[in-house]
């Protein structure tokens, strides 16, 4: 990069590099549009410096919206923090247009503060911190109507201007699909000297309509050379609180996550049921991982596999 990027720069990794409307008049336009010249985004060095004390990063992905990815992110974080009290965990909500983590983590109404090292993330527990664009809005009902370049710029700020401190694991709650946000965060966090430090977990429900998009997400990770820890099947069954019988609310017509994992050679980390207690806790921001139930039993196995993948 020969000159500072314009405000709405699509990024050198984007297919729109040198072609977008923001590129008109930029001194770098000719360089960015040349496929034979590999460029390094100047923001990458800032991210590397800011994240130097973050040991591992875990992308929580799903191709389909509404499969409970944000809920799973909060549950994993809570359980990991409770079962590993000597480790530090962070959550970065990069679903810019639909931030859910402030509510799920019981931090609605909190705000971030500026320190000498950048934005200070919101403390959730002694060993858990959270950053989300939700903390920067005047109202929880405010709509964020941004194009890709502006969202990418916000993600770059979250990675380079937040004082994360020493973290053993940073979990990133991502939007559905394989959009600009995914390309940006991967380009900033991939470390060729330590490729195992960035990994991914897929979240799906048993229906084929969800599995179809998760397959695309898996192929995205393979193309980007991101190791996949495994797949979590969410909402796999519902256990009645009165009779104790289990029902499949979303039947696995094509074999569910287990069949897909076998087909694509990806580990199945476990399955999480539909749980009324968890549903209520998500709305109130409570932490229910301290209680023993079918969900926390499943989380125990899933979280142990995740931690083992980074050891």
UniProtKB/Swiss-Prot annotation:
The keyword 4Fe-4S applies. Keywords: 4Fe-4S, ATP-binding, Cytoplasm, Iron, Iron-sulfur, Metal-binding, Nucleotide-binding. Its cofactor is [4Fe-4S] cluster. ATP binds at residues 63-70. It is found in: Cytoplasm. GO terms for molecular function: 4 iron, 4 sulfur cluster binding; ATP binding; ATP-dependent FeS chaperone activity; iron-sulfur cluster binding; metal ion binding. One of its GO terms (biological process) is iron-sulfur cluster assembly. Gene3D superfamilies: P-loop containing nucleotide triphosphate hydrolases (3.40.50.300). Heterotetramer of 2 Nubp1 and 2 Nubp2 chains. Component of the cytosolic iron-sulfur (Fe/S) protein assembly (CIA) machinery. Required for maturation of extramitochondrial Fe-S proteins. The Nubp1-Nubp2 heterotetramer forms a Fe-S scaffold complex, mediating the de novo assembly of an Fe-S cluster and its transfer to target apoproteins. Belongs to the Mrp/NBP35 ATP-binding proteins family. NUBP1/NBP35 subfamily. This is Cytosolic Fe-S cluster assembly factor Nubp1 homolog. It comes from Drosophila yakuba.
């Amino acid at each position: 990069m020969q000159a500072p990027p314009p405000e709405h720069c699509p990024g050198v990794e984007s297919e729109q590099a040198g072609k977008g409307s923001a590129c008109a008049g930029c001194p770098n336009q000719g360089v960015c549009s040349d496929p034979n010249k590999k460029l390094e985004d100047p923001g990458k060095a800032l991210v590397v410096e800011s994240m130097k004390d973050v040991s591992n990063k875990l992308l929580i992905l799903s191709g389909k919206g509404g499969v409970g990815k944000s809920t799973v992110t909060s549950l994993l974080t809570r359980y990991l923090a409770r079962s590993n009290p000597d480790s530090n965990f962070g959550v970065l909500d990069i679903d810019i247009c639909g931030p859910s983590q402030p509510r799920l983590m019981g931090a609605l109404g909190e705000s971030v503060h500026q320190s000498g090292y950048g934005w200070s993330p919101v403390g959730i527990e002694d060993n858990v911190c959270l950053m989300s664009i939700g903390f920067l809005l005047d109202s929880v009902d405010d709509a964020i109507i941004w194009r890709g370049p502006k969202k990418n710029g916000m993600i770059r700020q979250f990675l380079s201007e937040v004082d994360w401190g020493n973290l053993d694991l940073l979990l990133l709650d991502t939007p559905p699909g394989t959009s600009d946000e995914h390309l940006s965060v991967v380009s900033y966090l991939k470390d060729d000297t330590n490729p195992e430090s960035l990994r991914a977990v897929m979240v799906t429900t048993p229906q084929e309509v969800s599995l179809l998009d998760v397959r695309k997400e898996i192929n995205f990770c393979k193309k980007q050379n991101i190791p996949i820890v495994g797949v979590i099947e969410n909402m796999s069954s519902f256990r009645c609180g009165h009779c104790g019988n289990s029902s499949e609310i979303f039947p696995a017509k094509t074999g569910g996550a287990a069949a897909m994992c076998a087909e694509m050679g990806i580990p199945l980390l476990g399955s999480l049921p539909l749980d009324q207690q968890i549903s209520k806790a998500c709305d109130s921001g409570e932490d229910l991982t301290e209680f023993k139930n079918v969900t926390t039993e499943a989380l125990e196995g899933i979280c142990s596999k995740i931690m083992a993948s980074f050891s």
